[in-house]
């Protein structure tokens, strides 16, 4: 005996059957990759002093990343570039800790979890603040050099200025590196052994002689046979990298930062690679031959302090 199925029920059964068949045979949607993973960070600056940093995230597929702030800071102002470089400036009178949240976005639109950046606001030991460094990403680095007794800018009519874009001389940078390394200086140095010894200031000679004896520097030739130091010549980024690398005795790395591969001479490539691996190369450097500025030197040396503190 055939069972009678009402037309309406038969129609619904047919629709259900076709829907199930289509679901069973449909190809799964293509995935757009995994979400990036953002890193929690901690930085320190002085009360009222701007500090720069770089947001960090890793994408499993190696996609390019951009960054966006999800939770703003409550004790200061924040400027963030799409590539992750940021500047945080504490509000006057604020102390303790502050923080902000951010996410990383890949080219497929995948978003990371929210990561946090904790900022510690500490009290200075000195009263050195620079009137020409307000809101500058290198302000904290500049003040840190003064705090550590390595370099202090000029005091003009009761106000300190750092002159961040001023080129650093070879003798100035060498002296800062030797002070940072803690190497004992040779005493009562009257002659360094370089052909241009007469052009080297008396205050710099102990640094030059100590660095020469320890292999930190070797000088260069100016077209003649005798080696010269060139104390008052502006130091290049590549030269500074070699001196700092040797002064800190960094471990050689095989990693070469891609941005420098075609702009680094052979004699500087290892040192540039070593500093890049340790995060010591300053933001905005375009070539090894460029003159190193004061603010770039400050950034390099404060990162070097971090490396030494972690040893």
Walk through the language-model features, giving the residues of each.
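Sec-dependent N-terminal signal peptides of Gram-positive bacterial secreted proteins and lipoproteins
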Residues: 3-24
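Extracellular and select intracellular beta-sandwich modules with Ser/Thr-enriched
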Residues: 39, 97-98, 110-117
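Surface-exposed, short loops/turns at beta-strand junctions within beta-sandwich domains
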Residues: 92-96
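Low-complexity "stalk/linker" and mucin-like segments enriched in Ser/Thr/Pro/Ala/Gly
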Residues: 70-83, 154
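Short strand-edge motifs at loop-to-beta-strand transitions and within beta-strands
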Residues: 84-88
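Extracellular ectodomain surface segments
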Residues: 32-70
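Conserved structural position at the C-terminal beta-strand
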Residues: 104-106
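Feature responds to low-complexity, polar/acidic, surface-exposed segments characteristic
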Residues: 23-35, 41-42, 118-139, 152-174, ...
């Amino acid at each position: 005996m055939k069972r009678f199925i009402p037309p309406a029920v038969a129609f619904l059964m047919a629709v259900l059957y076709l829907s199930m068949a289509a679901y069973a045979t449909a190809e799964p949607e293509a995935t757009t990759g995994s979400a990036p993973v953002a890193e929690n960070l901690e930085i320190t600056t002085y009360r009222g002093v701007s500090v720069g940093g770089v947001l960090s995230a890793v994408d499993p597929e190696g996609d390019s990343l951009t960054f966006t702030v999800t939770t703003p800071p409550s004790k200061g102002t924040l400027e963030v570039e799409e590539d992750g470089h940021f500047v945080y400036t504490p509000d006057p009178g604020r102390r303790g800790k502050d923080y902000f949240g951010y996410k990383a976005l890949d080219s497929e639109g995948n978003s990371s979890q929210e990561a946090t950046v904790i900022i510690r606001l500490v009290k200075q030991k000195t009263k050195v603040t620079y009137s020409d460094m307000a809101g500058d990403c290198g302000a904290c680095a500049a003040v840190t050099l003064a705090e550590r007794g390595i370099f202090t800018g000029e005091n003009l009519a009761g106000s300190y200025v750092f002159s961040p874009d001023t080129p650093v001389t070879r003798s100035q940078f060498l002296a800062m590196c030797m002070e940072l390394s803690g190497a004992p200086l040779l005493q009562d140095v009257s002659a360094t052994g370089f052909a241009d010894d007469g052009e080297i200031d008396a205050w710099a000679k102990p640094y030059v002689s100590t660095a020469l004896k320890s292999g930190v520097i070797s000088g260069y030739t100016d077209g003649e046979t005798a080696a010269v130091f060139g104390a008052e010549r502006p130091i290049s980024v590549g030269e500074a990298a070699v001196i700092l690398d040797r002064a800190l005795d960094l471990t050689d790395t095989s990693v070469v930062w891609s941005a420098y591969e075609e702009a680094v001479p052979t004699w500087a490539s290892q040192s540039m690679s070593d500093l890049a691996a340790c995060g010591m190369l300053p933001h905005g450097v375009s070539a090894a031959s460029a003159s190193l500025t004061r603010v770039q030197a400050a950034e390099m040396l404060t990162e070097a302090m971090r490396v030494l503190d972690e040893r």
